[in-house]
Amino acid sequence: MSRNMEVNAGSSGEIPSPIRNRFQKSGSQAVYEVTETKKSCVTRVDMPGCPESDLTYWVDANNVHFFADEPAMPEYENAGRKYGGSMIFNPEAYDVKKTKVKLINGVLWITVPKIPGKNASINVKERILHY
């Protein structure tokens, strides 16, 4: 499995390490995971607090773009978190036009089917988008 990351790093040019969720008792600590099945590439992105009704996504060439906002809670002086990014897939190995996207209980699932007969190894690039 290969992951390439393109982000706007801070002034030091270094990418900050993710902070471990001390309240999480089991499971992966990663904010996102990319896995391969026999028929597809499945990406899991944690977007806690975001309702499915707020998800916006679209497919553009070999890119899958997504955005969602956690609702603001003024009574707790919380403006809500905003999430968004793009996943770039190899168009020679994946049928990106047939991508399926679901947001279930604050977890975004992006499923991109493999093109039959093509040797697809996971080489997905992600981009963090700021809007």
UniProtKB/Swiss-Prot annotation:
Gene3D superfamilies in UniProt: 2.60.40.790
Q: Which residues form a coiled coil?
A: none
Q: Which InterPro entries match?
A: A-crystallin/Hsp20_dom (IPR002068), HSP14.7/HSP23.5/HSP23.6-like (IPR044656), HSP20-like_chaperone (IPR008978)
Domain (sHSP) spans 22-131
Keyword line: Cytoplasm, Stress response
Record's compositionally biased regions (Polar residues): 1-11
Q: Where in the cell is it found?
A: Cytoplasm
- Does the keyword field hold Cytoplasm? yes
What domain of life is recorded for the organism? Answer: Eukaryota
> What's any one GO cellular component for it?
cytoplasm
Presence of the UniProt keyword rRNA-binding in the record: no
The UniProt similarity line reads: Belongs to the small heat shock protein (HSP20) family.
Subunit note: May form oligomeric structures.
Name of protein: 14.7 kDa heat shock protein
Q: What organism does the record attribute this protein to?
A: Arabidopsis thaliana
